[in-house]
């Protein structure tokens, strides 16, 4: 098929001069910088023209529509995402079938009956009331829930939401009361009767008038008396309206921690609790101590986990008396991470840290009320080791009311859970159903623990555990018509990275009837390799669809740069070592071909965000190896990423181009700056982005595809396409219909490029 790509305006007068350690001053041209102006009529017209070209390729037939319909049919089953108990109330997230967004429900815990033999799902959920339904706010699913924070009693809930996929959040508040507290007008009487019929102990939900705007990556925590809450936000950007949130490219600076008192209408009334104007790029996280006597504030200067730690021990007094908050620096030299876990009445405070422990450990610090705090840079704090570092990664620590620690570890990218007492004595392992991923939900206020477990071929199942006996019981499992986990296989292999021979883990999933030895199986491989994030197993009905429809193989390459093996593994794929990520991924492809799983003509790869950068880099470096590439919301311009929205925080992984040493690394792999100019070979590629992505702004993809089409559009016959989704952002919270349309287009792209005939 011949492609008539749009004639994108190229301005060769735009350039920057960078300082290079290797070459002195270097001039780098940036002819498509005008595409960074997302709101310009020229850019909008260009987007429409590019989308038209992409649709002309995808819509040669109705394959996308057929795939979308089939996947939607497979998704037509009841599924539960999470359960959280507060007081006597149980909140849970449920999608009854194919709604764009999950609904949040509420029920009294006493109305749930759990099977004593642990072999069948709990019952009583039909009595739950609808607490929050995002689908009522937008028909197309572009209103999405970002955070959901329940107070200790369960009587109040703060939730934040976003629109059109933007990272900007707004905060709203709901209150839960009994129907006896409702005022007795006609409508309320009808509501009371309806609730009685549902036999739901007469809970009712009241919307409070509080509304807070211009939050991003916010950390919300309720105060002790539930009269207000802590959160953090940025100043409102100067040149953007509420309707255009997510389309601006301004750098996000001057994050502050605020206190909001219930009843105050909006953020203009809120009190600043903590700020650091001399370090405007810092972002803050907050956590109240177990007894709410202290507020801990973590200050992050970038995306590294290492942070400073501050404590306010007079928080309640300062709120009650409207006096000043006394901020004390506990950690002030970014030497490690210190995540607060809990504390005892005797003043022993527990923290998860990587201090002298790249795989992490649990320590405690003694903080007495009458003891002044001297920061660690000036006085060596006395750390007591509770759980020593092991040779596998400590991921998280939770506690229950029984004063036990439930410690989640990751060993070779498989989750295990161990139980310890507060002295660090090992008690037992929690026996999980098998290899896979487990997420644990517990609080110190009750004995109930919920564990979600899944892997690539097993749907997410929720288990319940009483911390008095730590017995794992089935709580809720999905029923997917026609699906059996036993029909599929998932195995883990280890291969050598081609240059330095580092062993890299990789998951391979396929249907047992698939021939994985002929070297001809259609293969869909993905990876991430960044920001200390581990790419763990999770179940996806869409991936199962690929295994079935393509008779194919799905692969996760756990390349360096992630958190799979702790700090050293992350650093081995960051900054000057970033090339290791690309080499590892290239090595994964070579392994699959060498071991006769697939061949170059049947290999499709996909990655998003930092994984989108991975796709751009490997396409430039090994265009002969990959037949089909899909890059979602990728970071493609490595010389300018730090100048837009939250990009300045990514320098922890990438470095920055105004540093001569970093420039010499970035210029060698930046996808935008390394498009081959004289090649007659390049993978079929489709970039996917959203016009409201304010994390990795769409200009990264706009500029990269423009350069590809300019340099190679008339030299190669492979498609060089971009799919720009309207009213979409970086991906989080995307509605089911948008997700489905996107994956249908991607699988359609796979089938056409890999020459796989799909039978419908």
Curated annotation (Swiss-Prot):
Catalytically driven reaction(s): Hydrolysis of Pro-|-Xaa >> Ala-|-Xaa in oligopeptides
EC number: 3.4.21.26
PROSITE patterns xref list: PRO_ENDOPEP_SER
InterPro entries from the UniProt entry: AB_hydrolase_fold, Pept_S9_AS, Pept_S9A_N, Peptidase_S9_cat, Peptidase_S9A, Prolyl_oligopep/macrocyclase
Organism classification: Eukaryota, Amoebozoa, Evosea, Eumycetozoa, Dictyostelia
Gene Ontology biological process terms from the UniProt entry: proteolysis; regulation of gene expression; regulation of signal transduction; response to lithium ion
Keywords per UniProt: Cytoplasm, Hydrolase, Protease, Serine protease
A Pfam family of this chain: Peptidase_S9_N
GO MF, any single term: serine-type endopeptidase activity
The family this protein is said to belong to: Belongs to the peptidase S9A family.
Matches recorded under Gene3D superfamilies: alpha/beta hydrolase, Prolyl oligopeptidase, N-terminal domain
TM helices/strands, residue ranges: none
Regulation: Inhibited by chymostatin, Boc-Glu(NHO-Bz)-Pyrrolidide, Z-Pro-L-prolinal dimethyacetal and the peptide H-H-L-P-P-P-V-OH.
GO cellular-component term (any): cytosol
Species this protein is from: Dictyostelium discoideum
Gene behind the chain: prep
Record's subcellular location: Cytoplasm
Positions of the catalytic residues: 609 (charge relay system), 693 (charge relay system), 730 (charge relay system)
Name of this protein: Prolyl endopeptidase
Disruption-associated phenotype: Resistance to lithium due to elevation of inositol (1,4,5) trisphosphate.
Function: Cleaves peptide bonds on the C-terminal side of prolyl residues within peptides that are up to approximately 30 amino acids long.
């Amino acid at each position: 098929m011949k492609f008539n790509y749009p004639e994108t305006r190229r301005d060769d007068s735009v350039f920057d001069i960078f300082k290079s350690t290797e070459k002195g001053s270097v001039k780098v041209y940036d002819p498509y910088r005008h595409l960074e102006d997302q709101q310009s009529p020229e850019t909008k017209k260009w987007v429409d023209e590019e989308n038209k070209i992409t649709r002309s390729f995808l819509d040669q037939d109705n394959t996308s529509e057929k795939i979308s319909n089939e996947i939607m049919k497979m998704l037509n089953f009841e599924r539960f995402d999470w359960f959280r108990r507060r007081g006597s109330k149980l909140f849970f997230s449920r999608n009854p079938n194919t709604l764009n967004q999950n609904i949040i429900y509420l029920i009294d815990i006493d109305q749930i009956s759990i099977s004593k033999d642990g072999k069948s799902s709990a019952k009583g959920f039909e009595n739950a009331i609808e607490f929050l339904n995002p689908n009522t706010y937008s028909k197309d699913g572009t209103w999405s829930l970002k955070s959901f924070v329940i107070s200790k009693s369960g009587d109040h809930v703060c939730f934040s939401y976003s629109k059109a996929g933007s990272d900007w959040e707004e905060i709203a508040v709901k209150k839960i009361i009994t129907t006896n507290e409702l005022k007795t007008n006609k409508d309320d009487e009808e509501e009371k009767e309806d609730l009685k019929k549902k036999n739901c102990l007469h809970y009712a939900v009241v919307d409070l008038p509080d509304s807070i705007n211009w939050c991003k990556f916010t950390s919300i925590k309720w105060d002790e008396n539930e009269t207000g809450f802590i959160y953090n936000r940025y100043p409102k950007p100067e040149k953007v309206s509420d309707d255009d949130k997510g389309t601006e490219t301004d750098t996000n600076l001057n994050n502050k921690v605020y206190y909001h008192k219930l009843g105050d209408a909006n953020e203009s009334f809120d009190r600043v609790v903590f700020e650091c104007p001399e370090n405007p790029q810092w972002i803050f996280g907050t956590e109240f101590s177990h007894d709410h006597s202290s507020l801990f504030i973590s200050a992050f200067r970038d995306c590294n986990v290492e942070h400073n730690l501050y404590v306010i021990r007079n928080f309640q007094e300062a709120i009650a008396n409207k006096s000043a908050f006394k901020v004390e620096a506990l950690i002030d030299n970014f030497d490690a991470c210190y995540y607060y876990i809990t504390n005892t009445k005797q003043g022993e405070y527990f923290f998860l840290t990587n201090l002298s422990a790249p795989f992490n450990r649990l320590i405690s610090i003694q903080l007495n009320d009458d003891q002044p705090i001297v920061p660690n840079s000036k006085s060596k704090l006395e750390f007591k080791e509770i759980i020593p570092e092991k040779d596998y990664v400590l991921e998280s620590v939770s506690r229950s009311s029984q004063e036990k620690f439930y410690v989640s570890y990751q060993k070779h990218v498989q989750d295990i859970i161990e139980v310890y007492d507060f002295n660090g004595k090992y008690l037992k392992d929690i026996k999980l159903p098998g290899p896979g991923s487990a997420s644990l939900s517990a609080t110190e206020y009750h004995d109930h623990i919920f564990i979600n477990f899944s892997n690539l071929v097993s749907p997410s199942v929720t288990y319940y555990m009483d911390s008095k006996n730590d017995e794992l019981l089935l709580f809720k499992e999905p029923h997917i018509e026609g699906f059996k986990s036993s029909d599929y296989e998932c195995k883990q292999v280890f291969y050598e990275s081609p240059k330095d021979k580092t062993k890299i883990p990789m998951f391979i999933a396929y249907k047992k009837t698939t021939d994985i030895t002929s070297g001809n199986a259609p293969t869909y491989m993905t990876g991430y390799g960044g920001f200390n994030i581990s790419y763990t197993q999770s179940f996806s009905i869409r991936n199962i669809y690929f295994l079935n429809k393509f008779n194919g193989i799905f692969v996760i390459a756990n390349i360096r740069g992630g958190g799979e093996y702790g700090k050293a593994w992350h650093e081995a794929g960051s900054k000057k070592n970033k090339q290791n990520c690309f080499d590892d991924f290239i090595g994964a492809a070579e392994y699959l071909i060498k071991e006769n799983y697939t061949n170059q003509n049947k290999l499709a790869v996909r990655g998003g965000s930092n994984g989108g950068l991975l796709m751009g880099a490997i396409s430039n470096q090994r265009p002969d190896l990959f037949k089909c590439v899909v890059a979602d919301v990728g970071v493609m311009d490595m010389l300018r990423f730090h100048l837009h929205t939250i990009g300045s925080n990514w320098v922890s992984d990438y470095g920055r181009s105004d540093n001569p040493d970093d420039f010499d690394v970035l210029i060698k792999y930046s996808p935008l700056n390394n498009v081959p100019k004289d090649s007659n070979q390049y993978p079929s590629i489709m970039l996917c982005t959203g016009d409201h992505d304010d994390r990795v702004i769409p200009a990264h993809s706009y500029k990269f595809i423009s350069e590809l089409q300019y340099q190679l559009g008339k030299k190669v016959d492979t498609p060089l396409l971009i799919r720009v989704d309207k009213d979409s952002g970086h991906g989080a919270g995307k509605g089911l219909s948008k997700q489905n349309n996107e994956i249908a287009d991607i699988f359609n792209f796979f089938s056409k490029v890999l020459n796989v005939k799909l039978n419908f």
